Amino acid sequence: MSTSRTVDRAFETALYDTGDDALDTAASLLAADPAADAELLARGEEFVATAWRRGWQPADLVRIVRRELDDVHVRMVAALIRAQAPHDRPRGPRWAAQLDAVPDQAPPRTDRFSHATDVLRLYRLLLRLPALEPLDDAPGAPRREARPESRALARIRALLAKAEATGYPEEAEALSAKAQELMARHSVDEALLAARAQGSAVSPDTPGACRIGVEPPYEQAKAVLLDAVADANHCGAVWNEPFGFSTVVGFEADLEAVELLYTSLLVQAETAMTKAEAGQRAGGRKRTKTFRQSFLAAYAHRAATRLRAAAEAATAESAATGAAADANLLPVLASREVAVTERLERLFPETTTTRLRGVSDAAGWTEGTRAADDAHVERRRPLR
C-alpha cells in the first residue's frame, strides 16, 4: 500500500467519525507505516491553509485547540502553523504578531500509536471548523504596514502597568482615568492626521478588525466588559460565545487601545475580586460562583460608565483646545463612526442580544461596583 493511500484510509476511517474505535483503527494504520509521517504533516499544513481561507487566524486556531483539546494538541497545531507560514501569502502586521506569539514548545515524544492518535484528534477538529468572518485584507489589496509605537501609546501602556501593580485603589482609579483620557486624545489625533493626509474632512483610512479571546470562566461578564471598552474607544464588538472570542471593529489606533485597556482592566478586576472574596471569607461568609459572576457583571457595568465619561470629556476638550482644535474634527469623527458601523454590519448582518445570567449576589454586585470605581485605565501589551 502506498504512503498516500495509508493516510487516505486512516482519514476515511477516523476523521468523519466521532468514535474511539475508529480513531484506534486509523492510528494503528499510521503507526504501522513510518513512511506516512511526512504525508501526515503535509496534510496537516493543508488543513491549516484551509482554515486561513475560511477566515481563521493563527491566534484563533491556537485558542480553539486549547479550548477543545489538550496541551499536546496546542503544540501540534502551533508546529503546523509555523511550518505552513513560509508557504502562505503576504499578510499584515497583526497576522505577523500572531505568528510571533504562537507557542514554540515542541510536541512531546511518544510512541507511534499515541502520536498518531493525537494527530487524528487534532485533524478531526480542524476538519470541522466552520467559516468565520474574514478580517484580513483580500489577496492583492493594499496591505496595512506596521508602524512604530507612538509616544502616546507608550505612555498609556506605562500608565496601565502602574495601575495593575499599585496596591492603592485611589491611585489605580486616577491612573485608569488618565489612560482613557490619553486614549481618547490619541484617537482624535490619529483621525485628524488621516483626514489631513487625504486633504478632506473624510478620513481615507478604513476600519480594521481583530478578535480578542474571552476566556472562561464568567465569559458573559467579560464579554460585557470588552464591549464597554470597545464602545468607549469608538469601536464595536460582537461576541462569539461558542468559539470564545469577540470581534472588535474600529480604526487601528482605537483597536490598539481596546486590546490594551481590556487586558489591563481584566487583570485589575480579577485581582480586586480575589481581595473581595478574602474579605468576605474573613467576615464568615462563604463566597460562591454567583458572587464572582455578580462581581464581574457589576465591574463591567460601572467601568462602562466611567470609560464613556472619560472618553467624552477628553474628546470635548480636544475639540475646543490644543492642536486638535479643528473645524474638521466633528465631521471626521462622524465619518469614522459611520465607517465602523458599516463595517460591523457587513461582517455581522444578523446579531442577537443575550441577558447576563447569574447576577443575583448583592454583595458581589456592591464589591464589583466599588472595584470598578477604583480601577486604573491604562494600557499593557496588546492581545493578538
Go through each PLM region and give its residues.
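Intrinsically disordered, low-complexity linker/loop segments enriched in Gly/Pro
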Residues: 143-165, 173
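Extended, helix-rich structural scaffolds rather than catalytic motifs
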Residues: 1-148, 188-384
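Short amphipathic alpha-helical coiled-coil/interface segments
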Residues: 156, 160, 172-186, 296-303
